Amino acid sequence: MSETHLSTKKFADFPLHKEVQQALNEVGFEFCTPIQALSLPILLAKKDIAGQAQTGTGKTLAFLVATFNHLLTEAAPTERKINQPRAIIMAPTRELAIQIAKDANLLAKHTGLKVGIVYGGEGYEAQRKVLDKGIDILIGTTGRIIDYVRQGVIDVSAIQAVVLDEADRMFDLGFIKDIRFLFRRMPDAKSRLNMLFSATLSMKVQELAYDHMNEPEKVEIAPNEKTSKNIKEEIFYPSMEEKMPLLLSLLEEDWPEKAIVFSNTKHSCEKVWSWLEGDGHRVGLLTGDVPQKKRLRILEQFTSGDIDVLVATDVAARGLHIADVSHVYNYDLPDDCEDYVHRIGRTGRAGQKGVSVSFACEEYALNLPAIESYIQHSIPVTSYDSEALLDDIPAPKRIHRKPSSHSRNSRDRSGSRPQGGHRGNAPRRHDKTRRHS
């Protein structure tokens, strides 16, 4: 975590339970991020908050520290049953729930509190067996939580702490009825510690907060900056014919450590994947059609570095929290302005630098004015030399509806990246620059 992303406030400055502080010390967290420094004094005073913060600001640790501290300093309800968790953390996607659970388990090490995670798509019986043993903190997606509530596997009537993460995405994905269903089955808002976090505190999000929370205090981090200053943005105006050669050429020139390429449709993503795979890149594909087990495997490979480039639609990428993404490429400009912010927010996180490259082609260039109006600044335009684009691009690989998770056809060339790189051991083809300032 970069020091430019941290405040001068230390976790040790707060009256945290000794086991929470011990866990923080062991994982190396000493200084708070701004959202942690602002929210923890409120939460430790047992007051509710509605926090506005982008992903990568440290909000997850803020609400986890508050949740663990609350459960360790408050007595459990008398006659609490084994199927009654004490805290519930709701997330819009499986991937976000999984990441929250990983972070929660780091804090749970010395506390004796049990963490359980539930999400749709797989593992129904396995997840149920964990719940049957009893848990203190339930983390999951609303649909699967409701399934277990309706079956009596989970009873939320003893909840002492509630977290709603990425509330704006909950609205986008149509989960608000599910959330209200769960809130109505919990104890009164005044008897719980309630936390809501959202990238934007729109009127609908604030209405949800005031309906189901106890006079929450609003906490905002850089509300006027929709895009991070740590992200270098640029935009190209390629023709439809030069769009793919430009992408492949920029990947060759930028040689990003970890990149995500966004496209607007499943078909377009498959096309991009085919060209990158044919060119020998170690590339994964995430669309709504990818089965959950394969999706998790691809994400694990991307996180571990076995895949360098991930091609994804907006829906498939929602909730992704992957560290160290150096570049984001908008192969298509999104139709939704907020999607642009969410896309490029995958890079430049936790104080790191990132690069966002967008293509304004003939089909999607009309989306640009609305995007620039929404982010309140113009995206710098970069020109390129058509003659410098790669001209030895292999044919795309046929997808056969079962794309491999990474390249298996890397060409045998000695390379500048030992044990991998975008084309296995393949080096860059040449050092010609394609950008013109």
Swiss-Prot record:
Please state the protein's primary subcellular location: cytoplasm
Enzymatic reactions: ATP + H2O = ADP + phosphate + H(+)
| Residue span(s) of domain Helicase C-terminal | 243-390
Q: Region (Disordered): which ranges?
A: 394-437
The domain of life is Bacteria
Q: Where does ATP bind?
A: 53-60
An example of a Gene Ontology BP annotation on this entry?
Answer: RNA catabolic process
Looking at the UniProt record for this protein, which Gene Ontology cellular component terms does it annotate, in alphabetical order? cytosol
* InterPro entries, alphabetized: DEAD/DEAH_box_helicase_dom, DEAD_box_RNA_helicase, Helicase_ATP-bd, Helicase_C-like, P-loop_NTPase, RNA-helicase_DEAD-box_CS, RNA_helicase_ATP-dep_RhlB, RNA_helicase_DEAD_Q_motif
Sequence motif DEAD box, location on chain: 165-168
- Please give the subunit comment from the record: Component of the RNA degradosome, which is a multiprotein complex involved in RNA processing and mRNA degradation.
Q: Which family does it belong to?
A: Belongs to the DEAD box helicase family. RhlB subfamily.
Summary of the function given for this chain in its UniProt record: DEAD-box RNA helicase involved in RNA degradation. Has RNA-dependent ATPase activity and unwinds double-stranded RNA.
- Know the name of this protein? ATP-dependent RNA helicase RhlB
Origin species, per record, is Shewanella piezotolerans (strain WP3 / JCM 13877)
Q: What is the lineage of its organism?
A: Bacteria, Pseudomonadati, Pseudomonadota, Gammaproteobacteria, Alteromonadales
